[in-house]
Curated annotation (Swiss-Prot):
GO terms for biological process: fatty acid beta-oxidation; phenylacetate catabolic process. Its EC number is 2.3.1.16. Belongs to the thiolase-like superfamily. Thiolase family. Pathway: Lipid metabolism; fatty acid metabolism. It catalyses: an acyl-CoA + acetyl-CoA = a 3-oxoacyl-CoA + CoA. The keyword Isomerase does not apply. It is found in: Peroxisome. One of its GO terms (molecular function) is acetyl-CoA C-acyltransferase activity. The keyword Acyltransferase applies. This is 3-ketoacyl-CoA thiolase B, peroxisomal. One of its GO terms (cellular component) is peroxisome. The lineage of its organism: Eukaryota, Fungi, Dikarya, Ascomycota, Saccharomycotina.
């Protein structure tokens, strides 16, 4: 009997083998694309709103994937800065792009993880049998909403002096200063990390590495004389060549500390989406399967050091999947700020060569609600079939999220 138990244990697949197995009820990724990311306030999307970006993008997404829109049963779009997370205008964008009204819609706002939460929402609906096909993504126009006073939270005066409430209202840049101070992350290290992000992204743009994940879309810019001009946006506007730690070191801190415009993520505009299906449906309809969604986990952390979120969310998703850091082939950890990304990656022992291979949000930009979906569009081309990827980000008010996917 002991011998039989030993043999049974040997035949049982380990966690990695189990995740790589293909089953009819898997949640698979049929497509993942994004727009080029526009610079906030002065880039190619500066004069259009998120619903315009999303409409134009979804039109191209449907055309590129040749998906039958009537198969889409639900759409989840992440957004942070629009009122009600874009619930009305982004539903309208879906309809304007050609998705039928029979597809339901949900607006998702969990700050910087909103795009990933949209993916998780659709994936979980497929897992539970609510739907068999859904579209998840994110869209953000920081150019039109970032400085809108209506975006600021309004707190009941009876709670205005509550210590815990106050922690949730700390500006993101100050929370990064807290991380840098508490964990001794110097300005020099932050600038070195940021320079590497710029250099990797600039190299990726120059080599055309992003072309497979970007769908060129139409935008409209307003000239100084009031006339409008139609343009095509197909290249990320944040990356630039020749950035060094020394050049970044000359920038003035945004606060009383080490955070600067050079070692923090850029204010940006853009959209991204992931088409998810039940494997059996994708196979029956003949759609290509480029990946498999595995799991997403979210962890809470102290709001005043919210940037450490990935250091807690990554171990959580690894524990729940039975994987180890060594099982992961590529990591995409959002670079909200250099200090928090550095800390999180080091706490989890992420090998530098596996982290943000083509740069991150410091160089590319961070359209808040779009980032989680953008990471999927970016990481999938970096993975070889059978490899495993992990995406993660910190979340304002004290959280972190992380997800696991497999390339097929």
């Amino acid at each position: 009997m002991d011998r039989l138990n030993q043999l049974s244990g040997q035949l049982k697949p380990n966690a990695k083998q189990s995740i790589l197995q293909k089953n009819p009820d898997d949640v698979v990724i049929v497509a993942a694309y994004r727009t080029a990311i526009g610079k906030g306030f002065k880039g190619s999307f500066r004069n259009v709103h998120s619903e315009f970006i999303l409409t134009e993008f979804l039109k191209e997404f449907i055309k590129k994937t040749n998906i039958d829109p009537s198969l889409i049963e639900d759409v989840a779009i992440g957004n942070v800065l629009n009122q009600a997370a874009g619930a009305t205008e982004h539903r309208g964008a879906c309809l304007a792009a050609g998705i039928p009204y029979t597809a339901a819609f949900i607006a998702v706002n969990r700050f910087c993880s909103s795009g990933l939460m949209a993916i998780s929402d659709i994936a979980n609906k497929i897992k539970t049998g609510e739907i068999e096909c859904g579209l998840a993504g994110g869209a953000e126009s920081m150019s039109t909403n970032y400085r809108d006073p209506r975006v600021a939270p309004r707190i009941d005066p009876h709670l205005a002096d509550d210590a815990q409430m106050e922690k949730c209202l700390i500006p993101m840049g100050i929370t990064n200063e807290n991380v840098a101070n508490q964990f001794n992350i110097s300005r020099e290290r932050q600038d070195e990390f940021a320079a590497k992000s710029y250099n990797k992204a600039a190299k990726a743009v120059a080599s055309g590495a992003f072309k497979s994940e970007i769908l060129p879309i139409r935008s409209i810019i307003r000239n100084s004389d009031g006339t409008e001009k139609e343009i095509i946006v197909d290249t990320d506007e944040g990356p630039r060549e020749g950035v060094t730690a020394e050049s970044l070191g000359k920038l003035r801190p945004a606060f009383d500390g080490t955070t600067t415009a050079g070692n923090a993520s850029q204010v940006s505009d853009g959209a991204a989406a992931v088409l998810l299906m039940k494997r059996s449906l994708a196979e029956a309809k003949g759609y290509p399967i480029i990946g498999k969604y595995v799991l997403c986990s979210t962890a809470g952390v102290p709001p005043e050091i919210m940037g450490v979120g990935p250091a807690f969310a990554i171990p959580e998703v690894l524990k729940r999947t039975g994987l180890t850091v060594d099982d992961i082939d590529v990591f995409e950890i959002n670079e909200a700020f250099a200090a928090q990304c550095l800390y999180s990656a080091e706490q989890v022992n992420v090998p530098e060569e596996k982290l943000n291979i083509n740069g991150g949000a410091i160089a590319l930009g961070h359209p808040l609600g779009e980032t989680g979906a953008r990471q999927y569009a970016t990481i999938i081309p970096l993975l070889k079939p059978g490899q495993i990827g992990l995406t993660s980000m910190c979340i304002g008010s004290g959280m972190g999220s992380a997800s696991i996917l497999v390339r097929e």
